[in-house]
């Protein structure tokens, strides 16, 4: 009787964990290498322009941003 209860609880627990995992991974890509490639493509160091709040002393600002607050250390890209 105790063994049956333990088995039923174990099956319910494993089923619940499978359902939770399925919901979590639904919107993620299947292959990790593809995700890593996308992350490397969008890496901050791979861009040729500075994003909002980044310094614009050594690189130009991205389209739609302007270099503001010029001082000794250079400005920052802002809207």
Swiss-Prot record:
GO CC aspect terms: extracellular region
Location in or out of the cell: Secreted
SS bond partners: 49-62, 56-67, 61-77
Domain of life: Eukaryota
Residues where 4-hydroxyproline is found: 60, 63
Signal peptide start-end: 1-22
Listed InterPro entries: Conotoxin
Primary role: Ion channel inhibitor that inhibits the increase in intracellular calcium upon depolarization in DRG neurons. In vivo, both intraperitoneal and intracranial injections into mice induce hyperactivity.
Protein name as catalogued: Conotoxin Vi6.3
Species in which this protein is naturally found: Conus virgo (Virgin cone)
């Amino acid at each position: 009787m105790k063994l049956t209860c333990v088995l039923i609880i174990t099956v319910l627990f494993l089923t619940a964990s499978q359902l939770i995992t399925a919901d979590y991974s639904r919107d993620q890509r299947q292959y990790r290498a593809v995700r890593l490639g996308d992350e490397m493509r969008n890496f901050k160091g791979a861009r040729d322009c500075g994003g909002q709040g980044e310094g614009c002393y050594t690189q130009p600002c991205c389209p739609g941003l302007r270099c503001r607050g010029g001082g000794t250390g250079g400005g920052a890209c802002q809207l």
